[in-house]
């Protein structure tokens, strides 16, 4: 009996111990479920897998590209054996000045935003099933490297037909562009609406980063239907209308009909407001009549703005939410953590918590302030660089040369110039991203130093490290300040004298003695000046890192700056291959070959006027109106002929003498 009772007691004790043992893990999930940490966004499982979306879009893009190829006839690659066969359409006419620029800008913005969305995604190519799921040890992550490299080629090919629909200039192409843009926009909107949150980086990062992508696709989904309606309404009249109002003719009209500046404008005194306005006009790009930025520069501006948004968004959502979570989770245990490092902020633990939260808030303010300052400076540098682009292009159009040292000044295209022209827009985007990141680091360190070494100690009256350092080293700084002040005062009052209105040296013995005696002190001053020089150089280079029109190296070493070297070759390529004067001349030649219409509107051009170039001199100038038609013809002839013959930038368009040529262009 006693043994059974003891056994029952033992079994009951074991049961109690097991119950108490299980109670230790009462917070563990039951049934093998995993407990999600607080604040972690679960992965979204869409109803339709993204692989199906991308497969359909890829097939649709290939079909659209095939249909566009049927509309384009191949004439350049094999003119003898392949004439009239379908050819691959061009996505963007980069060297054509009269094509719409909004479509390439929107497509490039969509492409760059899609590449930025590759950062948080797990599947770079969603329509391909990866070999192995991601593991905890990161082995599967390394296997995704080749797929990410392949994604850099997949997305340009995916959006290739979307851009090519605008270059074909056909109603069917506009219809295909409308369908393709609607498909892309519908897929993106459906995905963002079904899964607005993502567990990577920040829960709304994918949604915020896709805003430029949605904006570009939304514009394309409206632009293509509008062009389709216009093609049905106007027909082929739109092409001739665009040809008559071409940029090249406007450029020549502005160039050959410049009004003389009034002499009073140079002698009148400008006030402060007018001087400020002139400085604003020279610092900020304002569109001017008769000049249009090349398409490559327009794309660079669009991608720079998109890069500023994407990098700023990544820097913001990658750091600020983490700081806010840390500040919200501060408890009294932080006092023990700081005491372990020998830091005692206060005897009251609650006061320590408030101080730590206040310092974390100051850290967040410094970070956001540095980010705002970096974005503003990058944007201002972008706007100011457009003025430099316009000045350099106008100089090259007039036949000038850029002073960049030993680089060749030949206007003809070369292998290096073509490579630089191809990579200019991509380089500009990369320089902007890296420049914004470097500025953020430098400005954050600067604001952090000012906040925690100057403002916060003075506000709380404790941890005055900077003031203690200045208190202990004031003789050193006072000596340097007195040395600089006394040398400047002596140079002005003792060693400089004016004779007959001309300054000259005096008291040379005292000057030599002071120079010898103050040499050790000047070494210390030079050390401080060298540190200040390094700081200024770092700030200047960080601010101007995103600008390719400026060299970060001296003029003699400008060829070693790859960004500036690429920019100069890009300008030469643009000036030699898309010169407005040569384009206008070719347009006039093509126009004279057309049959003369029966009825010419008032704004139209007669055949004789086209041959003589009189339409380039249609101006409201009274002097030009008072002159006879022969005088206008002479000015047009000499102006255009002199530009075509004596402008070095147009040498690339010249051909050798034709054998057996006859006057007036007749061929035997």
UniProtKB/Swiss-Prot annotation:
- Posttranslational modification: Phosphorylated on tyrosine residues in response to RBP4 binding. Phosphorylation requires the presence of LRAT, suggesting it may be triggered by the uptake of retinol that is then metabolized within the cell to retinoids that function as signaling molecules.
Which residues does the annotated region (Interaction with RBP1) include? 236-294
Q: Which regions of this chain are Cytoplasmic-facing, per the record's topological domains?
A: 73-101, 167-169, 228-296, 390-423, 496-510, 549-668
Domain of life from the UniProt record: Eukaryota
The segments annotated as topological domain Extracellular are 1-51, 123-145, 191-206, 318-368, 445-474
Expression by tissue, per the entry, reads:
Expressed in placenta, spleen, retinal blood vessels, and in astrocyte perivascular endfeet. Not detected in the endothelial cells of the choriocapillaris (at protein level).
Pfam families in the cross-refs: RBP_receptor (PF14752)
Q: Where in the cell is it found?
A: Cell membrane
Task: Give residue numbers for the modification (Phosphotyrosine).
Answer: 642
Q: Where is the composition biased (Polar residues)?
A: 1-15
According to the record, mutating residue 315 to P results in: Expressed at the cell surface but reduced RBP binding and vitamin A uptake activity
Keywords noted in UniProt: Cell membrane, Glycoprotein, Membrane, Phosphoprotein, Receptor, Retinol-binding, Transmembrane, Transmembrane helix, Transport, Vitamin A
Q: Any transmembrane segments, and where?
A: 52-72, 102-122, 146-166, 170-190, 207-227, 297-317, 369-389, 424-444, 475-495
Indicate how the chain sits in the lipid bilayer: Multi-pass membrane protein
A GO MF term: retinol transmembrane transporter activity
Gene Ontology CC terms: plasma membrane
Q: Identify the stretch(es) annotated as Disordered.
A: 1-28
Q: Which residues are glycosylated?
A: 8
Q: What's said on domains? A: Contrary to predictions, contains nine transmembrane helices, with an extracellular N-terminus and a cytoplasmic C-terminus. Besides, contains one long helix that dips into the membrane and then runs more or less parallel to the membrane surface.
Quaternary structure and interacting proteins, as annotated: Homodimer. Interacts with JAK2 and STAT5. Interacts (via extracellular domains) with RBP4. Interacts (via cytoplasmic domains) with RBP1.
> What is the recorded function of this protein according to its Swiss-Prot or TrEMBL entry?
Functions as a retinol transporter. Accepts all-trans retinol from the extracellular retinol-binding protein RBP4, facilitates retinol transport across the cell membrane, and then transfers retinol to the cytoplasmic retinol-binding protein RBP1. Retinol uptake is enhanced by LRAT, an enzyme that converts retinol to all-trans retinyl esters, the storage forms of vitamin A.
Protein name (Swiss-Prot/TrEMBL): Receptor for retinol uptake STRA6
Provide the species name. Bos taurus (Bovine)
Chain's gene name: STRA6
């Amino acid at each position: 009996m006693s043994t059974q009772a003891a056994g029952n007691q033992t079994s009951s004790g074991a049961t109690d111990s097991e119950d108490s043992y299980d109670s230790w893990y009462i917070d563990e999930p039951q049934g093998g479920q995993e407990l999600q940490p607080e604040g972690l966004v679960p992965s979204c499982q869409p109803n339709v897998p993204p692989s199906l979306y991308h497969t359909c879009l890829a097939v649709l893009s290939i079909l659209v590209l095939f249909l566009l190829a049927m509309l384009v006839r191949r004439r350049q690659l094999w003119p003898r054996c392949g004439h009239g066969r379908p050819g691959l359409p061009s996505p963007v006419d980069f060297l054509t000045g009269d094509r719409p620029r909004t479509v390439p800008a929107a497509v490039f913005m969509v492409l760059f935003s899609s590449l930025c969305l590759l950062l948080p995604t797990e599947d770079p190519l969603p329509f391909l099933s990866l070999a192995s799921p991601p593991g905890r040890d990161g082995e599967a992550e390394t296997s995704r490297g080749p797929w990410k490299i392949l994604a850099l080629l997949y997305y340009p090919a995916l959006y290739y037909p979307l851009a090519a629909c605008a270059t074909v200039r056909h109603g069917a192409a506009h219809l295909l562009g409308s369908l393709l843009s609607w498909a892309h926009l519908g897929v993106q909107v459906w995905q963002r609406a079904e899964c607005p949150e993502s567990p990577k980086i920040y829960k709304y990062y994918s949604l915020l980063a896709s805003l430029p992508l949605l904006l570009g696709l939304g514009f394309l989904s409206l632009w293509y239907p509008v062009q389709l309606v216009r093609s049905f309404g106007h027909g082929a009249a739109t092409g001739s209308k665009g040809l008559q109002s071409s940029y090249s003719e406007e450029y020549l009209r502005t160039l050959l009909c410049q009004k003389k500046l009034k002499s009073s404008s140079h002698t009148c005194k400008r006030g402060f407001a007018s001087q400020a306005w002139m400085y604003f006009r020279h610092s900020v790009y304002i569109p001017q009549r008769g000049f249009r930025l090349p398409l490559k520069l327009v794309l660079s501006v669009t991608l720079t703005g998109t890069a500023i948004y994407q990098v700023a968004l990544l820097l913001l959502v990658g750091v600020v939410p983490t700081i806010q979570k840390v500040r919200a989770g501060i408890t009294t245990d932080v006092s023990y953590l700081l005491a372990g490092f020998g830091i005692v902020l206060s005897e009251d633990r609650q006061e320590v918590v408030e101080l730590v939260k206040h310092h974390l808030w100051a850290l967040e303010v410094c970070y956001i302030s540095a980010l705002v300052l970096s974005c503003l400076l990058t944007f201002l540098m972008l706007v100011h660089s457009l003025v430099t682009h316009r000045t350099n292009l106008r100089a090259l159009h007039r036949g000038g040369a850029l002073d960049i040292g030993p680089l060749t000044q030949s206007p003809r295209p070369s292998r290096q110039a073509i490579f630089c022209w191809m990579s200019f827009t991509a380089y500009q985007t990369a320089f902007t991203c890296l420049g914004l990141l470097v500025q953020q680091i430098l400005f954050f360190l600067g604001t952090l130093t000012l906040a925690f070494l100057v403002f916060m100690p003075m506000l709380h009256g404790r941890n005055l490290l900077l003031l203690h350092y200045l208190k202990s080293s004031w003789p050193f700084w006072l000596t340097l300040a007195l040395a600089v002040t006394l040398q400047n005062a002596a140079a002005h009052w003792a060693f400089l004298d004016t004779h007959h209105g001309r300054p000259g040296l005096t008291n040379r013995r005292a000057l030599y003695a002071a120079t010898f005696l103050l040499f050790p002190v000047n070494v210390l001053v030079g050390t401080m000046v060298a540190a200040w020089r390094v700081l200024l150089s770092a700030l200047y280079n960080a601010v101007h890192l995103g600008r390719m029109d400026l060299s970060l190296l001296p003029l003699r070493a400008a060829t070693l700056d790859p960004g500036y070297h690429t920019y100069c070759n890009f300008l030469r390529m643009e000036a030699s291959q898309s010169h407005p004067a040569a384009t206008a001349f070719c347009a006039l030649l093509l126009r004279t070959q057309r049959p003369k219409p029966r009825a010419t509107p008032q704004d139209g051009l007669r055949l004789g006027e086209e041959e003589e170039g009189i339409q380039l001199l249609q101006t409201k100038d009274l002097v030009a109106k008072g002159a006879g038609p022969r005088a206008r013809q002479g000015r047009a002839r000499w102006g255009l002929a002199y530009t075509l013959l004596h402008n070095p930038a147009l040498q690339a368009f010249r051909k050798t003498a034709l054998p057996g040529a006859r006057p007036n262009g007749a061929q035997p």
